A protein has these predicted regions:
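Preference for well-ordered, secondary-structure-rich cores of eukaryotic proteins
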Residues: 25, 31-32, 55, 59-63, ...
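Core AdoMet radical
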Residues: 94-106, 115-132, 146-162, 172-187, ...
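Conserved C-terminal portion of the radical SAM core fold
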Residues: 147-152, 178, 199-203, 224-339
């Protein structure tokens, strides 16, 4: 069956997040667009889980049966997303993806593109929120709603200093997880999860190849410590790909030749052969024509350097048109031997 959908909807993705008013929600999407399928995170664990399952069923029915965009209710916002495309539709109604990105959660970084409050989080609020989140997760597991091979993504602040780290790691024991980390602190339990679960991984948004640019983007002068901790995680891996890196391109800030070539050298040391090329999503839907030219030009340069070093990349946050333009420009850069 072919119908308009996206990968996250088909996985019944459970994204613990915050809306624009900073209210906790569970959504089937993590795009920064209005009217995405979501529920408010209010009530008991039983009530919240019922609301989520019911929302998934309504979204599933709409994807299967509604072709006219003007008649959409639960996926009304999805039509503005580049990921919402005609595709073979298959949904077993189990949760195959859990993304824990709810706040307040502590993080040592001061990334210039991050909109999360830089102040210390309200511990009382954080405790109450994560008590409820863990109750929902434990109930979903107990009721068999989460697929055994589900992918867990932990991206709330920094897991190594999270107040609920121990309880989260207990849930994740023996499960496939990707830990979004700033690598400022090495975590033995995360390293053990990598060793025990070949499908687990860590992801660092490295965003720089030099100490100077790292300091500019992240707010800390500790790039050597970051690369040291990356190497320590690498020692605990059992297959290629368990160390994954992302590069958020910000034209005029971190798009120099030295940064791009240096990050490739770091990838070689860690046996990383793939890089996610990303963007500052705050202005994803409000960029000027010149902004788009600058972004795709920088992405093309990085893409070309990766290709020349037999490395691959993805550009999930770029539209199909932007990706096409990046590849065309990269091929031209390579053909003209500009790198």
């Amino acid at each position: 069956m072919v119908c308009r959908s996206c990968g996250l909807i088909q996985m019944n993705a459970m994204n613990f997040n915050n809306d624009k008013q900073n209210n906790p929600i569970i959504s089937l999407c993590c795009e920064n667009i209005p009217n995405i399928p979501q529920i408010s995170f209010e009530g008991t664990a039983e009530e919240i889980l019922y609301k989520f399952v019911n929302k998934c069923a309504k979204v599933d029915s709409e994807c299967r049966n509604i072709q006219n965009n003007s008649k959409r209710i639960f996926t009304k916002g999805c039509v503005n997303c580049s990921q919402f495309q005609p595709r073979t539709y298959n949904n077993d109604r189990l949760i195959h993806y859990i993304n824990l990105s709810a706040y307040p959660s502590p993080c040592q970084c001061r990334c210039i593109y991050c909109e999360v409050q830089k102040n210390e989080p309200d511990i009382t609020e954080s405790v109450k929120l994560f008590d409820n989140i863990i109750a929902v997760l434990e109930l979903a597991l107990e009721q068999g709603l989460i697929a055994p091979d589900a992918r867990w993504q932990i991206s709330s602040g920094e897991i190594a200093i999270h107040p609920y780290r121990d309880r989260l790691m207990k849930i994740l024991k023996g499960r496939n997880a990707i830990f979004y980390t700033n690598c400022m602190k090495f975590d033995e339990d995360v390293a053990q999860n990598l060793h025990d679960n070949p499908n687990s991984a860590i992801n660092l948004s490295i965003d720089a190849g030099t100490p100077e640019t790292w300091h500019k983007v992240k707010g800390f002068d500790n790039f050597d410590k970051i690369t040291e901790n990356l190497s320590r995680y690498f020692v605990n891996t059992t297959r290629p790909g368990q160390i994954s890196l992302k590069y958020i391109i910000m034209p005029g800030i971190n798009d120099t030749y030295e940064d791009f070539t240096s990050v490739v050298e770091i990838m070689k040391v860690l046996n990383v052969k793939h890089l996610t090329i990303s963007r500052d999503i705050r202005n994803k839907y409000s960029m000027s024509e010149q902004d788009t030219i600058d972004l795709t030009g920088a992405a093309a340069f990085l893409f070309a350097i990766l290709s020349k070093n037999n490395m691959t990349s993805d550009m999930f946050t770029y539209s199909p048109e932007e990706r096409k333009l990046v590849v065309e420009q990269a091929n031209e850069i390579i053909a003209k031997q500009l790198i």
